[in-house]
């Protein structure tokens, strides 16, 4: 499975790019917003989601882990596949999606080609609880390299290790405020170290 590609954009098409990695060209599909940022001849790091089927292997590329995570999150909704997930991400950023669901704004989804009233309703119903948890973490990650979904997973891990939800959120927020560029592994280690030192 391919998780990341570092290379030069060799060619640019309507819904994909060819990225040259050490002489090997990989065809990578991406959202319109991501494609608009990729310039032929320049080097980029793309986070990759690999879909393996009997008849094909498709690679989907993202400039941020947050967009990749939302690509997978959207596909958890009944009726949304890879093409529709990319279409939504071509029109809306992850933050746009969070805000729309938090504000119960179906119209922003219905304005996207292929998303009718029924699918917009399913997006609201099936992602509401997930997005609410993610949205509560968004303030924590304002100046951080870590995505909101990853922050939520860190807090769940800390709760499983004995933190209350309140303790986990306050601890994570305090650590990221002091070190916005901290990695997920170091974030968890620091949180546990801080908790142990307080006893």
Curated annotation (Swiss-Prot):
Region of interest called Domain I, as start-end residue ranges on this chain = 1-63
Tell me which SUPFAM superfamilies the record gives. Answer: DNA helicase RuvA subunit, C-terminal domain (SSF46929), Nucleic acid-binding proteins (SSF50249), RuvA domain 2-like (SSF47781)
- NCBIfam families referenced in this protein's UniProt entry, alphabetically: ruvA (TIGR00084)
Its subunit composition reads: Homotetramer. Forms an RuvA(8)-RuvB(12)-Holliday junction (HJ) complex. HJ DNA is sandwiched between 2 RuvA tetramers; dsDNA enters through RuvA and exits via RuvB. An RuvB hexamer assembles on each DNA strand where it exits the tetramer. Each RuvB hexamer is contacted by two RuvA subunits (via domain III) on 2 adjacent RuvB subunits; this complex drives branch migration. In the full resolvosome a probable DNA-RuvA(4)-RuvB(12)-RuvC(2) complex forms which resolves the HJ.
In the record, biological process GO terms are: DNA recombination; DNA repair
Please provide the record's keywords in A-Z order: Cytoplasm, DNA damage, DNA recombination, DNA repair, DNA-binding
> Which cellular components does GO assign to this protein?
cytoplasm; Holliday junction helicase complex; Holliday junction resolvase complex
> Which function does this protein serve?
The RuvA-RuvB-RuvC complex processes Holliday junction (HJ) DNA during genetic recombination and DNA repair, while the RuvA-RuvB complex plays an important role in the rescue of blocked DNA replication forks via replication fork reversal (RFR). RuvA specifically binds to HJ cruciform DNA, conferring on it an open structure. The RuvB hexamer acts as an ATP-dependent pump, pulling dsDNA into and through the RuvAB complex. HJ branch migration allows RuvC to scan DNA until it finds its consensus sequence, where it cleaves and resolves the cruciform DNA.
Asked if the record carries the keyword Magnesium, the reply is no
The UniProt annotation puts the region (Flexible linker) at 141-145
Entry protein name: Holliday junction branch migration complex subunit RuvA
Subcellular location, in the record's words? Answer: Cytoplasm
Gene that codes for this? ruvA
Care to name a GO molecular-function term for this sequence?
ATP binding
Query: Is DNA damage included in the keywords of this UniProt record?
Result: yes
Which portions of the sequence form the region Domain III?
Answer: 146-199
Domain remark text:
Has three domains with a flexible linker between the domains II and III and assumes an 'L' shape. Domain III is highly mobile and contacts RuvB.
Query: In which organism is this protein found?
Result: Rickettsia prowazekii (strain Madrid E)
Indicate the family of this protein: Belongs to the RuvA family.
């Amino acid at each position: 499975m391919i998780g990341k590609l570092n290379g030069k954009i060799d060619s640019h098409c309507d819904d994909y790019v060819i990225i040259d990695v050490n002489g090997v060209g990989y065809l990578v599909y991406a959202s319109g917003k991501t494609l608009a940022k990729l310039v032929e001849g320049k080097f980029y790091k793309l986070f990759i989601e690999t879909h393996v089927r009997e008849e094909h292997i498709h690679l989907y590329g993202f400039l941020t882990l947050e967009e990749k995570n939302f690509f997978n999150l959207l596909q958890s909704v009944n009726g949304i596949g890879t093409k529709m997930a990319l279409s939504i991400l071509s029109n809306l950023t992850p933050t746009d999606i969070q805000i729309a669901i938090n504000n119960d704004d179906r119209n922003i989804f219905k304005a996207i080609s292929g998303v009718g009233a029924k699918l917009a309703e399913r997006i609201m119903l099936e992602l509401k609880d997930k997005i609410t948890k993610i949205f509560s973490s968004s303030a924590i990650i304002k100046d951080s390299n870590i995505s909101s979904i990853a922050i939520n997973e860190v807090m769940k891990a800390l709760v499983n290790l004995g933190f209350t939800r309140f303790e986990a959120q306050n601890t994570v927020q305090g650590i990221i405020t002091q070190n916005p560029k901290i990695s997920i592994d170091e974030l968890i280690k620091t949180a546990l170290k801080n908790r142990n030192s307080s006893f």
